[in-house]
C-alpha cells in the first residue's frame, strides 16, 4: 500500500516539476475526459490561428464560403440580388474611371480594375450624366451659334434629353448583349483563354463612355475644328480601351474573325461619337421669328382705302 502511495506521490511531483519548468505546457483534466486541452495564457502556438479566425470570422459557414471562393447568391427576383451590383465604394468607382481614362498597353482592364466584381453603379450614372451633358451642351451650342441674330428666337429642345437617353442606354446595353452572345458562340467553337460575363462587358462599356462627358461639355465651343479634334481624342482613348480589353477574348480565334470583331467594336464606338456630334451639335435647327410679306392684293387694298 505504501508503494502505491509513493508511486502516486512521485507522479504528482513529476507533474508539478514539469509545470514549474514549462508553464506554457498543455494540461488535461483527467476527471473530465470530454474537456478539450487548455493552453496557458501567452502561448505563441495558438496566436496565429486566433488571428486567422479573427480575419475569417468565427462562423464555420462563413469560413467554408470564403475558402471555397463562393458566396450565397439571392434569387434574381429579390432586391438583394440586384443590390450586389451596386456594392462598390467611391474609391473603386474612381479607380475604374481612372483606368478607363488611362488605358495601359498590355494590361487587361477587367482583370486589373474590375477583378470579378462588376458593378452597375458606375455605368448607370456615367450614362445618365452623359445624357444630360449632351442634351444641355447641344442646346447651349445652338444658342451660342446664333447669339446676336435678331431674327433668331431661342427655344430649348427638351426632346434632346429623351433622344440622347435612348441612344446612350441602347448602346450601353444592346451592344454588350450582342458582343456577349457572339463571344459565347465563338467560345463554343474555339476555346479562348479569356472569357467575360455579360455584366463585365456592360461594366467595360459603361466606364469607357466617361471620357465623353468632358468632351460633350467642351463641344459647346462653336468651332468645328476643335470639336473634331476633341472627338478624335475621346475616340482614341475609349476605343483603345475596348480594343485592348476584348482582344484577349478573341485572340485564340481565327485571325480574320478576331480582327473583324475588334474592328466592328471600334466602328460602332466611332458611330456613336460621330453621330452624337453630328446630330446634337453640327446641325442646329433654325428657329427664326415669322416674317410677313405683303401680297399684291393687300397692296392694292391698302391704296384704295387711303
From Swiss-Prot:
Annotated GO CC locations: Golgi apparatus; Golgi medial cisterna; Golgi trans cisterna; late endosome membrane; nucleoplasm; plasma membrane; trans-Golgi network; transport vesicle
Membrane spanning residue stretches: 120-140, 163-183, 201-221, 228-248, 257-277
Bias kind Acidic residues: ranges: 50-59
Subcellular location: Golgi apparatus, cis-Golgi network membrane; Golgi apparatus, trans-Golgi network membrane; Late endosome membrane
Biological process terms in GO annotation: vesicle-mediated transport
Record: glycosylation sites: 297
Assigned keywords, A-Z: Endosome, Glycoprotein, Golgi apparatus, Membrane, Transmembrane, Transmembrane helix
Disulfide pairings: none
Compositional bias segments (type: Polar residues): 15-29
Pfam family, one: Yip1
A GO MF label: small GTPase binding
Superkingdom of origin: Eukaryota
Residue ranges annotated as Lumenal topological domain: 141-162, 222-227, 278-306
Segments for region (Disordered): 14-62
Residue ranges, Cytoplasmic side: 1-119, 184-200, 249-256
UniProt topology in membrane: Multi-pass membrane protein
Main location as per UniProt: Golgi
Subunit structure: Interacts with YIPF6; this interaction may stabilize YIPF1. May also form a ternary complex with YIPF2 and YIPF6.
Family that this chain belongs to: Belongs to the YIP1 family.
Protein name listed in UniProt: Protein YIPF1
Organism of origin: Homo sapiens (Human)
GN (gene name): YIPF1
